[in-house]
Amino acid sequence: MDESKKISLGQFFTPTHIVKYMIGLMTKNKNASILEPSSGNGVFLDSLIQLGYTNLTSYEIDGDIISHPFVINSSFITSYDKPQYDSIIGNPPYVRWKNLSELQKKELKDNSIWKMYCNSLCDYFYIFIIKSILQLKVGGELIFICPDYFFSTKNAEGLRKFLINNGSFEKIILFNESKVFHGVSSSVVIFKYIKGKNIDNINIINIDSKSPIKSEDIESLGESYYIPRFSSSDVWVTSPNHIKVALDKFESYCKTIKKVQQKSLFDDLSFLDKAFQMNDINYSELELLNSICVAKAKHLDAFCFSGYTRYKLILDDNNEDKLITYFPNFFYEFNNYKDYLLKRYSYNKYLPYWEVAFLRNFSLFSKNEKKIFVPCKERISKKSNFRFSLVDEFIYPTQDVTALYKKENVKESIEYITAYLNSKAVFLWMKYKGVVKGNVVEFSEKPLTNIPFRRIDWQLKSEKKIHDDITNLVRKYLSNKEFSILHEINLNLEKLGIKVEI
């Protein structure tokens, strides 16, 4: 298969046992009108035909992979949105905007549905969900397998609102880290959605296993429970209802965490990162003065950090002759990567190969104040806390780290904020209500600003004392790393209602 076509068209074909399970969720009779909007290699069609379904329609834009009397070899995106199907089933293509072909991008830019509900941050499969619902009859059923991140990402708010306004979910199967497709790392779900019907409760099948799914007996693999139907376009929580109640109680003590500002220093250095890293050699004093200490995700732990990597950073205007004269070791090391550095995208500006591209917020990071670093992404399947690290002055973040600064009008100490973010309550809140993709939590600006934050009531002496005790305990822990201090910190946090009891 053409690899570029596979990526731009999202061609990851569904295993037969998954197809059989999904068809088993259908309740319409064998004469029902059924649509498969992205047939791929025809595995859904073949299974439906074998089971006696005859009124079938399918779309597949790639005529090279299937030719079939039931298949229309054109784009489903341009199909007519008339409510005409009893059931729609399939595996829509998952493609990020940057991986779409120019023809696909133009098709979406010209599409009124895409313009109404989506944007260039959205995934291609969003429009397949929306158009499928538009083409269902009232009472019709949509059964799809797709990534689960539309439950939580900011860019899917329009899709979530559309789904709430046009029907209800009947069943959702959460695969989490279970392997469903070969070569696909995204966490996926199967859902059954009924158009125009208000279903009070959703049946959730939650599979908590990393083992590959090899059988159509899927429901025996996970925990089954019911949750109330989704009622807003906010993050959809699929955990059992008692967990949602506990999270709501925790939130009642808090406000959203707009008490910090999130910044980054570098744009992505990708594989050129090594070109700017300094090695274990005797650099000159001038070279050391033109370097910075950078913390990576691997250096971070809860509360503290374990080290840093030195990076070359020449800010003054120089030419290559000056580089050779004043920074001979830098010149030698950069020369090993020169060809690659010269090929970097420069936005049509002059970019010497020895300079970091698009350095941002440098003056902010150079302030003489502590800040909090956290990995941009964190796998949580075997963890019970995050790695919010209180970092010293003049330590800079690299591209796999998100940095948080306390705003000037915030009275709470940076130590208190660090303790709060490392609490079990915040961990559970992010686990169930944050942006989570396959047990990987994302710490970008929007997810961070959504975290509830427990402010101190400075009029209450008891709260002020707890705040000061937590501040001093964090400083003590950073000094001697005594594990018992963490228990004392948590006890004080719980006195402020910073806990989730599940």
Curated annotation (Swiss-Prot):
GO MF term list: DNA binding; N-methyltransferase activity; site-specific DNA-methyltransferase (adenine-specific) activity
Gene3D superfamilies, alphabetized: Vaccinia Virus protein VP39
GO biological process: DNA restriction-modification system; methylation
EC number: 2.1.1.72
SUPFAM superfamilies in alphabetical order: S-adenosyl-L-methionine-dependent methyltransferases
Keyword annotations of the record: DNA-binding, Methyltransferase, Restriction system, S-adenosyl-L-methionine, Transferase
Alphabetized InterPro entries for the sequence: DNA_methylase_A-5, DNA_methylase_N6_adenine_CS, MethylTrfase_TaqI-like_dom, N4_N6_ade-DNA_methylase, SAM-dependent_MTases_sf
Enzyme class per UniProt: transferase
Reactions mediated catalytically: a 2'-deoxyadenosine in DNA + S-adenosyl-L-methionine = an N(6)-methyl-2'-deoxyadenosine in DNA + S-adenosyl-L-homocysteine + H(+)
Pfam families: Eco57I, N6_Mtase
The family this protein is said to belong to: Belongs to the N(4)/N(6)-methyltransferase family.
PANTHER family associated with the record: DNA METHYLTRANSFERASE YEEA-RELATED, TYPE II METHYLTRANSFERASE M.HINDII
Name recorded for this polypeptide: Type II methyltransferase M.HincII
Organism: Haemophilus influenzae
Lineage, broadest ranks: Bacteria, Pseudomonadati, Pseudomonadota, Gammaproteobacteria, Pasteurellales
